[in-house]
């Protein structure tokens, strides 16, 4: 198992990017969360099998027709074994 913390820069707010992230995470059976930050970035944590996490990161970095990723900051985090879902967070709270 692997868990990553990611901050994504680019055109990633107001373009459905969080929903795209959640969809891609659920496709790969990942858990974690995603949220918008006040500075225009999107922040997330994702956890799952190492190969699934890497494929997820590659897909997120490619963006969508509307979302353009210019930079991703990725850090390893401790696995949370009790986490069961991947959720979109609103209002900036964890």
Swiss-Prot record:
The keyword Oxidoreductase does not apply. Keywords: Hydrolase. Its EC number is 3.6.1.7. It is an enzyme of class 3 (hydrolase). It comes from the Bacteria. Coiled coil: none annotated. One of its GO terms (molecular function) is acylphosphatase activity. InterPro entries: Acylphosphatase (IPR020456), Acylphosphatase-like_dom (IPR001792), Acylphosphatase-like_dom_sf (IPR036046), Acylphosphatase_CS (IPR017968). The active site is at 18, 36. It catalyses: an acyl phosphate + H2O = a carboxylate + phosphate + H(+). PROSITE patterns: ACYLPHOSPHATASE_1, ACYLPHOSPHATASE_2, ACYLPHOSPHATASE_3. Transmembrane segments: none annotated. SUPFAM superfamilies: Acylphosphatase/BLUF domain-like. Residues 3-90 form the Acylphosphatase-like domain. The keyword Transcription does not apply. Belongs to the acylphosphatase family. This is Acylphosphatase. The gene is acyP.
């Amino acid at each position: 198992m692997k868990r990553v913390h990611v901050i994504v820069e680019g055109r990633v707010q107001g373009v459905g990017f969080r929903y795209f992230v959640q969809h891609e995470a659920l496709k790969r059976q990942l858990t974690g969360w995603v949220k918008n930050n006040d500075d225009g970035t999107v922040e997330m944590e994702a956890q799952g099998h190492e190969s699934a996490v890497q494929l997820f990161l590659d897909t997120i970095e490619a963006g969508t027709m509307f979302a353009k990723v210019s930079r991703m900051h990725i850090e390893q985090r401790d696995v949370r074994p009790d986490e069961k879902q991947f959720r979109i967070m609103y209002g900036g709270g964890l």
